[in-house]
Each structure stands twice: as structure tokens, then as C-alpha cells.
């Protein structure tokens, strides 16, 4: 039986993929006590990297927000794996760390990462409200425009 969070995802038309396997010497998440640390997630959808390029150059703010949303969906996939498939065990999204591959003069990192923050609140309600960092990066793996990591509390 689907839980409340799965029902909310379905209502929003969001399909959560299986948690992506790491591409280097790390794991997708670590659980310490009741805290889950999710490794940086990139905008990968259906096995393909989306929105590759620098924000402020090839990638618009709106496209970067979509990239951030895909990152958030991939974070939710990792949390689902960490919770044994039951997203209702997520008590709180504690923090998101957002990295934006942008031109040196780009200053709208917070608006970009809102793509992920807004989704967390849409999906988890008040439990999705979190602290956050939104910073610029000179480059990100594979040239993706956004990477986001997360900290969450679980039951």
C-alpha cells in the first residue's frame, strides 16, 4: 500500500526512479543514527544527463531550476532507498546544499536551487522546509549545471 508521500508524488505526477548507483568511490547515502546524508545528486533522468552547461551562458535560470528539480527527485530516490522504500519515514528535510555551475558574473544561485526547495515543500509539506546553501561552482562533474546534496532526519 502506498504511503502519504508516495500518494503526494503520484498526485504531482512525479515518478521516483531507482536510486542511482555511485559513479566513483562513495555511496549514495550514509545513515548515522536518525540522520541520512545524501551524496550530491545531478540532473540525470532515464540514464541521461540533463541541462549540461554553464548557467548564465548555455543554460537559463528556468532550465537550471528544472535541473534542480531533477536533482531533488534523485535525492528523494536515495531517501526512499535509505528508508527501505517507505518515504513516510522521512521526518524532516534538514538541509540542501546546492551547487550551480555558472559563469563568474552569475548571481541567481538561490533562484536556481529554489527548483529543488520548492519541490521538497510540495512533496513533504512542512517537513520539507529546510536550511540551505546555494553557491556557484566553476565546474561540476560531466559539466552538469546543478548538483545538490541533502541531509534528512528519518524515523
PLM features per residue range, with description:
Residues 1-155:
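Short, polar/acidic, helix-capping and beta-turn segments at strand->helix junctions
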Amino acid at each position: 500500500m502506498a504511503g502519504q508521500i508516495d500518494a503526494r508524488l503520484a498526485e504531482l505526477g512525479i515518478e521516483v526512479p531507482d536510486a542511482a548507483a555511485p559513479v566513483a568511490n562513495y555511496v549514495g547515502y550514509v545513515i548515522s543514527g536518525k540522520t541520512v546524508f545524501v551524496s550530491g545528486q545531478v540532473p540525470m533522468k532515464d540514464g541521461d544527463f540533463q541541462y549540461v552547461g554553464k548557467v548564465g551562458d548555455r543554460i537559463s535560470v528556468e532550465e537550471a531550476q528544472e535541473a534542480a528539480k531533477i536533482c531533488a527527485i534523485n535525492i528523494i530516490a536515495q531517501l526512499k532507498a535509505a528508508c527501505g522504500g517507505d518515504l513516510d519515514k522521512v521526518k524532516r528535510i534538514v538541509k540542501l546544499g546546492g551547487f550551480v555551475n555558472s559563469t563568474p558574473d552569475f548571481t541567481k544561485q538561490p533562484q536556481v536551487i529554489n527548483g529543488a526547495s520548492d519541490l521538497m515543500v510540495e512533496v513533504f509539506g512542512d517537513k520539507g522546509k529546510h536550511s540551505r546553501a546555494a553557491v556557484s561552482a566553476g565546474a561540476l562533474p560531466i559539466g552538469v549545471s546543478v548538483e545538490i546534496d541533502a541531509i534528512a532526519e528519518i524515523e
